[in-house]
């Protein structure tokens, strides 16, 4: 029973988000870690992400039945009733938001709310099924965790938070399009209007290349803005160039699925590397950003 309730929260997604939360939190902490705040932020974000994933599983039951990758999910197989899953998701969300509000700060909580609403209310309920731009909208919610981690420490949305939002949003696009390419038939069978299905794989490759270039620029801004050091800069440049090279090789490959899977795997390596480096190679900016909102 416990295993089923764990599976429906998509623990892999939770773990991936925790890595980015830690990156944002430690970047902002700059070596001075409040461990109570750290724990509250990690657990709070985990609960909110878990809640969003359970709601997503509920909303996507009809789609999941049509896809090879998702046809054995807990709700599709009836291992947990839909009603129970809604109660479970609601309780997880309430607990997560309360922990962020009282354990971190209201700004961190509101960022969590915004990410949650975009993911569940905008992306899952509508955009995923009706628009080729669903991935773009969903990328904003996927970028929320590191920003929450950062703002849990700073209690302000400054240029550092904005750069993190840009980095992780831009990363989501080639990452997601790569999945859509090597899972092309699944998305086609479920009639999900992702870019590779609607516009074709060639167009998707162009978008992947452009987004990786934009991602590379955004990653450098963290050092140029005085938030991360030269070691981070070297790693960011290296992974960006390598990832871009992989994308460009996609124009000459014979098997798009194999190429897309490799691109997807490296995307995880890339974002994990950046999260680790921003955690350990931080700097104190010389001045505050012009874009600052203080609670």
Curated annotation (Swiss-Prot):
<dbReference type="GO" id="GO:0005886">
    <property type="term" value="C:plasma membrane"/>
</dbReference>
<comment type="function">
    <text>Converts heme B (protoheme IX) to heme O by substitution of the vinyl group on carbon 2 of heme B porphyrin ring with a hydroxyethyl farnesyl side group.</text>
</comment>
<feature type="transmembrane region" description="Helical">
    <location>
        <begin position="132"/>
        <end position="152"/>
    </location>
</feature>
<feature type="transmembrane region" description="Helical">
    <location>
        <begin position="84"/>
        <end position="104"/>
    </location>
</feature>
<comment type="similarity">
    <text>Belongs to the UbiA prenyltransferase family. Protoheme IX farnesyltransferase subfamily.</text>
</comment>
<dbReference type="InterPro" id="IPR006369">
    <property type="entry name" value="Protohaem_IX_farnesylTrfase"/>
</dbReference>
<keyword id="KW-0472">Membrane</keyword>
<dbReference type="GO" id="GO:0048034">
    <property type="term" value="P:heme O biosynthetic process"/>
</dbReference>
<keyword id="KW-0350">Heme biosynthesis</keyword>
<feature type="transmembrane region" description="Helical">
    <location>
        <begin position="233"/>
        <end position="253"/>
    </location>
</feature>
<dbReference type="InterPro" id="IPR030470">
    <property type="entry name" value="UbiA_prenylTrfase_CS"/>
</dbReference>
<feature type="transmembrane region" description="Helical">
    <location>
        <begin position="8"/>
        <end position="28"/>
    </location>
</feature>
<feature type="transmembrane region" description="Helical">
    <location>
        <begin position="35"/>
        <end position="55"/>
    </location>
</feature>
<dbReference type="Pfam" id="PF01040">
    <property type="entry name" value="UbiA"/>
</dbReference>
<protein>
    <recommendedName>
        <fullName>Protoheme IX farnesyltransferase</fullName>
        <ecNumber>2.5.1.141</ecNumber>
    </recommendedName>
</protein>
<comment type="pathway">
    <text>Porphyrin-containing compound metabolism; heme O biosynthesis; heme O from protoheme: step 1/1.</text>
</comment>
<dbReference type="GO" id="GO:0008495">
    <property type="term" value="F:protoheme IX farnesyltransferase activity"/>
</dbReference>
<feature type="transmembrane region" description="Helical">
    <location>
        <begin position="208"/>
        <end position="228"/>
    </location>
</feature>
<feature type="transmembrane region" description="Helical">
    <location>
        <begin position="107"/>
        <end position="127"/>
    </location>
</feature>
<dbReference type="InterPro" id="IPR044878">
    <property type="entry name" value="UbiA_sf"/>
</dbReference>
<keyword id="KW-1003">Cell membrane</keyword>
<dbReference type="InterPro" id="IPR000537">
    <property type="entry name" value="UbiA_prenyltransferase"/>
</dbReference>
<keyword id="KW-0812">Transmembrane</keyword>
<keyword id="KW-0997">Cell inner membrane</keyword>
<keyword id="KW-0808">Transferase</keyword>
<keyword id="KW-1133">Transmembrane helix</keyword>
<feature type="transmembrane region" description="Helical">
    <location>
        <begin position="162"/>
        <end position="182"/>
    </location>
</feature>
<feature type="transmembrane region" description="Helical">
    <location>
        <begin position="264"/>
        <end position="284"/>
    </location>
</feature>
């Amino acid at each position: 029973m416990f295993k089923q309730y764990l599976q429906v929260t998509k623990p892999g997604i939770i773990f991936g988000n925790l890595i980015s939360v830690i990156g944002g939190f430690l970047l902002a902490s700059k070596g001075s870690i409040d461990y109570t705040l750290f724990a509250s932020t990690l657990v709070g974000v985990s609960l909110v992400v878990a809640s969003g994933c359970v709601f997503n599983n509920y909303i996507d039951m009809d789609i999941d039945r049509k896809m090879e990758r998702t046809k054995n999910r807990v709700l599709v197989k009836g291992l947990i009733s839909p009603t129970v899953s809604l109660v479970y998701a609601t309780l997880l969300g309430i607990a997560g938001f309360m922990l962020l509000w009282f354990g971190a700060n209201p700004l961190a909580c509101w960022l969590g709310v915004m990410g949650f609403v975009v993911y569940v209310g905008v992306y899952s309920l509508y955009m995923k099924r009706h628009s080729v731009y669903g991935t773009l909208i969903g990328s904003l919610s996927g970028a929320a965790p590191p920003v929450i981690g950062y703002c849990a420490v700073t209690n302000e949305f400054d240029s550092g938070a904005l750069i993190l939002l840009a980095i992780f949003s831009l990363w989501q696009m080639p990452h997601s399009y790569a999945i859509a390419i090597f899972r092309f038939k699944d998305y086609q069978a479920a009639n999900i209007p992702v870019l590779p299905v609607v516009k074709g794989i060639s167009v998707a490759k162009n978008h992947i290349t452009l987004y990786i270039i934009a991602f590379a620029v955004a990653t450098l801004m963290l050092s140029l803005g005085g938030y991360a050091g030269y070691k981070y800069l070297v790693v960011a440049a290296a992974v960006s160039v390598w990832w871009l090279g992989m994308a460009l090789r996609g124009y000459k490959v014979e098997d798009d699925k194999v190429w897309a899977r490799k691109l997807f795997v490296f995307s995880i390596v890339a974002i994990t590397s950046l999260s680790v480096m921003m955690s350990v190679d931080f700097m104190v900016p010389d001045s505050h950003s012009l874009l600052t909102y203080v609670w």
